[in-house]
A protein has these predicted regions:
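N-terminal Rossmann-like FAD-binding beta1-loop-alpha1 element of flavoenzymes
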Residues: 2-28
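Short beta-strand to alpha-helix junction loop
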Residues: 102-115, 137-147, 187-206, 317-323
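Active-site substrate-recognition segment that forms the wall
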Residues: 43-46, 51, 55-93, 223-229, ...
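Conserved Rossmann-like nucleotide-cofactor binding loop
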Residues: 11, 34, 251
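Dinucleotide-binding Rossmann-like beta1-alpha1 core, especially the glycine-rich loop
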Residues: 42-167
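Glycine-rich FAD pyrophosphate-binding loop
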Residues: 21-41
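Short, well-ordered alpha-helices that flank and scaffold nucleotide-derived cofactor binding pockets
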Residues: 17, 21, 202, 206, ...
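Helical element adjacent to the flavin cofactor pocket in flavoenzyme catalytic cores
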Residues: 146-158, 180-235
C-alpha cells in the first residue's frame, strides 16, 4: 500500500517504521524542518504506567479551581477558550472511581503493549537514546499518600511491579535527593524507564530512510480528502494515497473535523528545562517525580531534564514567572 503519515514526531516515526518494515510505500509529511520538533522535542521522557493514570479522577475539578488562588500549582488555567471549559466539563463527568478504574485499566493494556514493542524495537535496532531504568515517586505527606492510592489500587489489580519505600530506602535508590526535603514515603517502579524522546525519534528516522521512507519537511498539510484514494492537500499540490495515518498531535483535530471526525482534544502545555550534569553524585540515577507538584527530574545521559507545570489553554507565549 501507498501510505501517507501526517506528523514526524515519535508517533509518526514509529508508525512509519512499522509500515515500511512490512514493505509498504511510506511518505511522511511535517510542517517543521525536521522530526520531533514539537511535542516530541523536550518532554519528560518518562515511560511509566503510573504517569499514564487518567487525569479525570475524584478531586481534579477542585485542584484546578483552587490552583487559581495559589502561587504555584501542578495544574492551572491559562488563556482558556470556551472549548477548554467544555472539555473540562466532560472530564468532570468521569471524575469518579468507577470510570477512573475502567479507563486506567485500558490505558495500562495499551502502555504494556507499547512498552513491549519499544523493547523489541530497541533490541532489534540496538538504539541508544540516553535511556535509564527505574522511576521514583516522592510522597511528601499523608495527603500525597492518599491521592496516590487510587492509582496504586488499579496497578495492584493488574500486577504492576512496584514497591512502597520508606524515606531511608528512597534515599538509597537516589542518593542525590536533597537531605532537607521531607519525604513521607516513596513509590518505586523498577521496570519503568526514561529516555530522550527526540534522540530516539531521530535515530528511528535514520532507520526509516534506510527502508525507503520518503520525508517531506516544511510541508504543511492544508486538508485531507476522503475517498477510495484519500488525498493529502498541500499548498501547491494534492497527492493520492491508499491510506492516510494522522499523527499530528493537536493539529489532528483541525484536519479531521471537515471529514466528520471530532476528536475530544484540548490544549495542555508544560514547561521543561535541560541542563548538563557537572557532578554525577548530585544528579538522579533515573527519574524522580514529586507527587504533589507533578514536577519530574529525569536523567538523560550526561543531562537532566526538569519538567512540569501543566497549563490548559492555547497561549504559546512562555510565562516569565514560570521561567524565573
Amino acid at each position: 500500500m501507498k501510505v501517507a503519515i501526517i506528523g514526524a514526531g515519535v508517533a509518526g516515526m514509529t508508525t512509519a517504521y512499522e509500515l515500511a518494515s512490512q514493505n509498504h510505500e511510506v511518505s511522511v509529511f511535517d510542517r517543521r524542518g525536521s522530526s520531533a520538533e514539537e511535542g516530541s522535542f523536550a518532554n519528560s521522557g518518562i515511560l511509566s504506567h503510573y504517569e499514564n493514570a487518567p487525569w479525570a479522577r475524584a478531586g481534579m475539578g477542585w485542584d484546578i479551581f483552587s490552583g487559581a488562588f495559589k502561587s504555584y500549582t501542578a495544574t492551572r488555567l491559562q488563556k482558556w477558550r470556551w472549548h477548554d471549559l467544555r472539555w473540562l466539563r466532560k472530564c468532570a463527568a468521569n471524575n469518579n472511581s468507577d470510570s477512573f478504574g475502567e479507563h486506567f485499566r485500558q490505558l495500562i493494556k495499551l502502555s504494556q503493549y507499547s512498552q513491549a514493542c519499544l523493547q523489541q524495537l530497541r533490541q532489534n535496532l540496538h538504539l541508544e537514546y540516553d535511556q535509564s531504568n527505574g522511576h521514583l515517586v516522592l510522597l511528601r505527606d499523608e495527603e500525597d499518600e492518599f491521592s496516590s492510592e487510587p492509582v496504586l489500587e488499579v496497578l495492584r489489580e493488574v500486577g504492576s511491579n512496584f514497591k512502597i519505600l520508606s524515606e531511608q530506602e528512597a534515599r538509597l535508590i537516589e542518593p542525590a535527593l536533597n537531605p532537607e526535603t521531607p519525604i513521607h514515603q516513596a513509590i518505586y517502579f523498577p521496570e519503568d524507564e526514561a529516555g530522550n524522546c527526540r534522540q530516539f525519534t531521530l535515530l528511528l528516522k535514520g532507520v526509516c530512510e534506510g527502508l525507503g521512507v520518503n520525508f517531506h519537511f516544511n510541508s504543511t498539510v492544508q486538508a485531507l480528502q476522503a475517498g477510495k484514494k484519500p488525498q493529502v492537500i498541500l499548498r501547491d499540490q494534492s497527492l493520492s494515497f491508499d491510506a492516510v495515518v494522522v499523527c499530528a498531535g493537536l493539529s489532528s483535530a483541525a484536519l479531521l473535523k471537515p471529514l466528520g471526525i471530532k476528536l475530544p482534544q484540548t490544549t495542555w502545555q508544560a514547561y521543561s528545562i535541560s541542563a548538563s550534569v557537572r557532578e554525577p553524585m548530585d544528579a538522579p540515577k533515573s527519574s524522580v517525580m514529586d507527587e504533589r507538584y507533578k514536577v519530574s527530574i529525569s536523567r538523560l545521559g550526561q543531562r537532566v531534564r526538569i519538567s512540569g507545570a501543566r497549563e490548559i489553554g492555547d497561549n504559546t507565549k512562555h510565562q516569565e514567572v514560570s521561567l524565573s
